[in-house]
């Protein structure tokens, strides 16, 4: 009996040491750690002071931007084959600043929307987000198996990540459409009832800019709920499509973050290395300090800018009866 137990224990240890199990186990660990961070933010973000919420915002944005930057580097690697070394196009193609910046800006916009929506999520939305973790892995494994016959090894990971993100997002939207179609619709009687039902989680936020953004988002939510409530009764297909469009941005942000969790460290390092030529995989290359510096500089600059603008705006609104967002909402 003891021999059988030792044999089983050894088999389990051997299984855990296999590259595939270690890689995808690490993905699950990173993905669920990410969900834990999002859960904490959903509970405490409305009460976080400006520097703390800015730290989470731009930290998540920097992480999410790795996916954009990695795909951009792979495209640059392909383009490198047609440029002569020493030419202007070759030097421009070797650069990273533009794509690191654009990837960070797009990620910051996505993360801002995600942070403002997190406190409003109900159990159903959290269920979809949690289900996205194993769904993404399942789609990735199938995509990797199918695409390895289509891509060269240098370009396979980027192709797999890109297709996995698209397919996972589509599947989540399709599942959400079924959920909405089965959900009973309760139309609102009046506009006042709609706006009374709108949640204002950031109304008392210590950050004036976050509070203002939350108020404007809640206004948009109210107008959307009013239109959707009416459309659900008379134009159900339009109602269904609009609900899917609204949630698609959230699913895109989540799948993008999961894509970063699926990237291995050597793939992330390629973002900061000189571009390789096809067939030169064994040539030693090292990360460039300038690329790393730019990647760190953008989040830091945006962090300082946000904290500074928030302080100036808070001071300017200190003696005002209504802020700009409050006045805008009242006028509407």
Regions found by a protein language model. Give the residues of each.
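Cytoplasmic membrane-interface regions of multi-pass membrane proteins
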Residues: 2-18, 68-93, 140-163, 261-286
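N-terminal membrane topogenic signal
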Residues: 15-29, 287-292
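Transmembrane alpha-helical insertion/packing segments
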Residues: 21-143
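Alpha-helical transmembrane segments and their membrane-interface junctions
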Residues: 104-126, 176-194, 301-318
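Long, hydrophobic alpha/beta structural blocks
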Residues: 126-192
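Internal/C-terminal transmembrane anchor helices
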Residues: 162-176, 285-310
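Membrane-interfacial helical/loop segments at transmembrane boundaries in membrane proteins
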Residues: 184-233, 317-332
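Individual transmembrane alpha-helix segments
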Residues: 224-250
């Amino acid at each position: 009996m003891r021999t059988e137990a030792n044999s089983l224990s050894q088999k389990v240890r051997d299984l855990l040491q296999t590259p595939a199990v270690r890689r995808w186990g690490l993905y699950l660990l990173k993905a669920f750690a990410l969900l834990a961070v999002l859960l904490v933010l959903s509970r405490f973000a409305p009460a976080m002071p400006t520097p703390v919420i800015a730290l989470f915002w731009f930290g998540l944005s920097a992480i999410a931007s790795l996916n954009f930057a990695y795909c951009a580097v792979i495209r640059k690697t392909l383009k490198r084959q047609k440029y002569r070394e020493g030419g202007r196009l070759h030097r421009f193609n070797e650069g990273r600043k533009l794509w690191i910046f654009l990837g960070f800006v797009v990620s910051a916009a996505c993360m801002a929307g995600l942070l403002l929506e997190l406190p409003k999520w109900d159990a159903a939305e959290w269920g979809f987000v949690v289900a996205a973790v194993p769904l993404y892995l399942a789609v990735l494994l199938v995509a990797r198996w199918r695409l390895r016959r289509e891509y060269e090894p240098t370009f396979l990971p980027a192709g797999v990540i890109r297709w996995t993100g698209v397919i996972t997002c589509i599947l989540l939207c399709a599942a959400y459409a079924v959920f909405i179609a089965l959900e009973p619709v309760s139309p609102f009687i009046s506009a006042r009832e709609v706006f009374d039902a709108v949640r204002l989680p950031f109304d008392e936020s210590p950050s004036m800019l976050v509070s203002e953004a939350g108020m404007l988002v809640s206004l948009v939510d109210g107008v959307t709920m009013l239109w959707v409530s009416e459309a659900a009764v008379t134009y159900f297909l339009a109602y269904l499509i609009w609900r899917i469009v609204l949630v698609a941005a959230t699913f895109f942000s989540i799948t993008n973050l999961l894509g970063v969790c699926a990237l291995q460290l050597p793939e992330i390092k390629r973002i900061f290395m000189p571009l390789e030529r096809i067939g030169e995989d064994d040539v030693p290359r090292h990360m460039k300090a300038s690329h790393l510096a730019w990647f760190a500089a953008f989040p830091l600059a945006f962090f300082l800018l946000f904290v500074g603008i928030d302080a100036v705006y808070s001071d300017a609104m200190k003696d005002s009866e209504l802020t700009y967002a409050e006045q805008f909402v009242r006028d509407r």
